[in-house]
Amino acid sequence: MTNANEKLITIFGADGFVGTQVVQDLAQAGYRIRVAVRRPDLAGHVKTSGDVGQILPIQANIRNMASVERAVNNADIVINLVGIKTKSGKQTFEAVHIDGAKNIAIAAKNANVENFVHLSALGADKNSDSIYSRTKALGEEAVLKAFPKAIILRPSIIFGNGDKFFNMFGAMAAISPILPMIGKDTLFQPIYVGDVAKAISLAATGKVKASKIYELGGADIESMQDLLKRVVKETGRKNILLPVPFWFAKTKAFFLQILPSPLLTIDQVKQLEDDNIVSEKAIKEKATLASFGIKATSMDIILPTYMWRFRNHGQFEKQEI
């Protein structure tokens, strides 16, 4: 290992979009990492981020307390990155965001781990009409009750190579002349996955104040319309941005959400009704990305590095300056 560190970190959901970046950062810092996932056989790609034997995928189901306890056994630090956007079978919002988070927090407390980091989401609100936002907030409460010194991070939309948001609209822009625009005036503060991973790593290694909720937003605050204009620009397309009323979007989502992998659900439409930016309260309490000493990376720098794949001629497409 490059900076060998005897401490062991268990990361739940380490094989996902954010998790792979977190594993890479912590592995480079020399930590031993236990990757707790439902399918270890599908998590082999994360092992390449470290030296031989440094990263170990193990089976864990956060709905099963026994498997969670095995995963955190002898760990010094625990990180929970598990979350879902749509429910599927037993993987409901309540089961994952509340019960699963609670199980991990309790197991971490009983294992006497030094630090526990829980990834939530900006907009978490137990009074929200959105089940996603509501269960995220209730999950935070469950975590803090079980592990009072936990650090909770609430990021806005996360972008980067492999993200869901820009890649989804990029793919749509490549095949359709029209891009549907739900909540065109709703504000977002997209944050780069690398910045989120750094914040998680710093929180996990005790570099910021514990027992606190941090709101993470990026360098730019833009409306949905502005974000889709970026998609059109980066893909070199001439798509028409079509405003879609919330009532119509919910009607369409009612039918789409019965599909195995729905493109849109009613709950997602509800989330789009509210701004997703760092609150004045968090700024006043110094509970933002700046608290980590991290300067937010602009979309201007990152989007061109992966959105080129949706251009007619890929990287060889002539771009306007």
Annotate each language-model stretch with its function:
Residues 128-130, 151-170, 222:
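Flexible, glycine-rich beta-alpha linker
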Residues 40-103, 107-110, 122-126:
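NAD(P)H-binding glycine-rich loop region in Rossmannoid oxidoreductase-like domains
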Residues 5-8, 32, 84-146, 150-155:
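Conserved Rossmann-fold NAD(P)-dependent oxidoreductase catalytic core, especially the SDR/UDP-sugar
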Residues 31-41:
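Conserved glycine-rich Rossmann-like NAD(P)H-binding loop of the short-chain dehydrogenase/reductase
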Residues 187-194, 216-233, 243-254, 295-298:
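Substrate-binding strand-loop-helix patch
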Residues 2-31:
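N-terminal Rossmann NAD(P)H-binding glycine-rich loop of SDR-like oxidoreductase domains
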Residues 103, 164-165, 183-205, 212-215:
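Substrate-positioning beta->alpha
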Residues 247-321:
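A hydrophobic C-terminal alpha-helical subdomain
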